[in-house]
Amino acid sequence: MIGVFDSGLGGLTVLEALVRRFPDQSFVYLGDHANVPYGDRPSEEIVDLTRAGVEHLFNAGCRLVLLGCNTATAMATRRLQQSWLPNEPRWAGRNVLGIVAPTVEAATRTPWAVTTPQYPQNMNDDLIFVFATTRTIDSRVYAEEINKRCPKVRLVEVACKGLVDAIEGGDAAAAGRIIEGVCRDALAAAGGERPDRVILGCTHYPIVADRFRAHLPEGVRIFSQPETVADSLDDYLKRHPDYAGRNDAPAVVQVLTTGDPMRVTAAGRRFWSEVPAFAAT
């Protein structure tokens, strides 16, 4: 069984992609809606909340947990992998993965574990736009990881303030205005140059990807995290089959929330129309 943890609803876009890609795999999703949003919280609190969510999923029987949230990934993944799990014997054989790594791998076409800069020759001075939340942009996780692999790539990062709230609130008009503004800002920062690729660095953004596409030059490749994460997990499970678990029982998809299940279910169906009803933790 594989777990997916998010501070709210955005991770449902990842869960939907995973369920489509792995129809024989069981998943448990946990949304920490009692504490959303994470972006305004201190870093240590984000780490603590993420660790608590991961523990809950481990206790539910998950051996592998994906953090379906860029803020949690940026703030907590390395701490959990390097400092927490190695010192918790009860969680031996379990692992936590973030969603920044597969996104950067796909956008730069380089493996995550690099010690020296590596990049295809035709990417030497490519222009990449990154759209994400303010907290993710401020963490510099995308800038640092992309520049480590492709130091000559030109990067334009734009924080999409208020977009997550507009999406979760179902305010399409507000979301459209924000997206139009951030795309205009990115193109202005690039001097009007067409980007070679665009990263949507928030799991809420795939459901408004068409809005981004409408305000960017035609044909620009947009990296949306759900499919990228599904591709990466497919590769990971081939290399680490023990985390896939047994497939001799019917696959189950369970969704949990620390908030109000009825309210979260209604809101969640804007992200994934077929999401099961949420249950309280």
Regions from the language model: what does each represent?
Residues 1-281:
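Non-catalytic structural scaffold of enzyme domains
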